[in-house]
Design a protein with these regions (language model features):
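Active-site glycine-rich loop that binds ribose-phosphate moieties when present
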Residues: 1-12
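Glycine-/charge-enriched secondary-structure boundary and capping motifs
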Residues: 14-140
Length: 140
């Protein structure tokens, strides 16, 4: 969102990720849906863990939406559950990005080591969810 993905992409390779995608036009929920669909799993995202740029939530609460919002909801909405999450945060999770961060799926046993290595390189990361058995995406 505020830095290029090259350093993070290079750092994660040594940890043998299960999946990596850049969060761009489909927004976080759309790309999580793609990851879940193509991998035959479910993705559970923690709403409280999502990084949000300063001022973005306030704009979403005021009803500001991008043109991609309805298209992303149409693309992934049938497979995405957002019950109990504010509409403003849901809108941000569907918001298309031109240069979003990476959505990385790592086996739990390697996640903490990657977090340490990324931190040592000065990379921002947030653990925002888990992969589970099932299908679809749940933002809770």
């Amino acid at each position: 969102m505020s830095t290029l993905n090259a350093a993070a992409a290079g750092a994660v390779r040594a940890f043998e990720p299960s999946a990596v995608t850049d969060v761009t036009g489909f927004g976080l929920l759309g790309h999580a849906y793609e990851l879940a669909e193509r991998s035959g799993v479910a993705v559970r995202l923690e709403a409280a863990a999502l990084p949000v740029l300063p001022g973005a939530l306030e704009l979403a609460e005021a009803g500001v939406r991008t043109g991609g919002d309805p298209r992303n909801r149409e693309f992934a909405g049938a497979a995405v559950s957002t019950e109990g999450v504010s509409e403003a945060l849901v809108a941000l999770a569907y918001d298309p990005q031109t240069a979003g961060g990476l959505l990385i799926s790592l086996p739990r046993a390697r996640a903490a080591s990657f977090e340490q290595a990324a931190g040592a390189r000065g990379l921002f990361l947030a653990r925002i969810g888990e992969v589970e058995a099932g299908s679809g995406v749940r933002l809770a």
